[in-house]
A protein has these predicted regions:
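Alpha-helical structural context detector biased toward long hydrophobic helices
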Residues: 5-311
Length: 311
């Protein structure tokens, strides 16, 4: 299964130029009865909430497009993400149906690996943050970290000769890395973990943000009195998921305050938030902005850390 959808074909020119960094198949799980999502983005007035369709949210032009030196555009990575989402979408819907009937999903090895790979690449789809926040100097710092001494000298010469073309190549490399397969060592680590299903109580709902996952302090459980930190990824208004140290699939029924804290954590790190409730999004628009340190996260991942949805 993993090998099937990790195969990659280059030089595909027939693709939409609008690329979603939060998949529409996830966004559609959050829409209201009319198929819309309430949203707010920084720069809008506090409390000013609008509504639109998933096709217009969490999207940028040519986000995953590689450009050659002649200006030709290659959309292979967008096609690749589309194939991955085509595999993940029916699995997620079946998963949600089981949870909503009060049952615990039974996952075989194929299900687990599909989920691990989907989560891994969902975490890597922070290219929008890279594009918005990283400077050429940041990209050079990344290059220096991964290059040999000889490669670094060659890169500096190229930068001094043609900075614009060198920056294009650096951007291409950063974009292409989104489709790099999960390292075998990391997949082994994923397989050693369990899955927690976080269920929101009635009259509450999760939101979506720029990053598909977050972490928050929630109430205690199991007789303890201390708050606990959980890392989670919302996949529907009533369901989020995360990893844990105990193998198997586990269900965690949250309180309304838990969901609020998790939504505040998502809003705090996001430029754009969206959800089913207009009043909820208006309230969360008051949360101050504290975006994640991308460079710190990148260097941490280079040292073998697991993605953010893992404890």
């Amino acid at each position: 299964m993993a090998a099937k959808f990790l195969r990659f074909s280059y030089m595909s020119n027939n693709a939409p130029h609008r690329h979603h960094y939060v998949p529409r198949m996830v966004q559609r799980n959050f829409t209201n009865e009319s198929g819309g999502l309430h949203f707010w983005r920084r720069g809008m007035n506090i409390g000013e909430v609008r509504i639109t369709k998933p096709s217009n949210l969490f999207v940028e032009d040519h986000l995953y497009t590689i450009v050659d030196k002649n200006g030709a555009r290659d959309h292979s990575i967008e096609h690749w993400f589309g194939r991955l989402e085509t595999l993940a979408a029916p699995f997620i819907q079946q998963f949600l149906n089981i949870v909503r009937h009060g049952m615990t999903p039974i996952m075989n090895g194929t299900h687990w690996d599909l989920w691990h790979i989907y989560v891994y690449h969902a975490q890597k789809r922070t290219v929008a943050w890279h594009k918005r926040f990283l400077t050429p100097e940041d990209l050079l710092a990344v290059m220096k970290e991964i290059a040999s001494e000889q490669q670094w000298r060659e890169h500096i010469r190229a930068w001094e000769t043609d900075a614009e073309d060198t920056l294009r190549e650096m951007n291409n490399a950063r974009i292409a890395s989104q489709a790099d397969p999960m390292p075998d060592k990391m997949l082994v680590e994923f397989r050693s973990r369990g899955l927690v299903i976080y269920v929101a109580p009635p009259q509450t709902s999760f939101i979506l943000g720029d990053d598909m996952s977050g972490d928050a302090l929630v109430s205690s459980r199991g007789g303890t009195t201390d708050a606990r930190r959980v890392q989670f990824m919302p996949i529907a208004p009533d369901v989020a998921v995360g990893y844990c140290d105990t193998r198997g699939v586990h269900t965690d029924h949250l309180t309304a305050m838990d969901v609020r804290r998790m939504n505040e954590a998502m809003a705090k790190q996001s430029y754009l938030i969206a959800g089913r409730s207009k009043a909820q999004i208006a309230s969360l628009s008051r949360i101050p902005y504290d975006p994640p340190d991308i460079m710190k996260g990148w260097f941490k991942s280079r040292n073998g850390a697991l993605p953010a949805c893992l404890p």
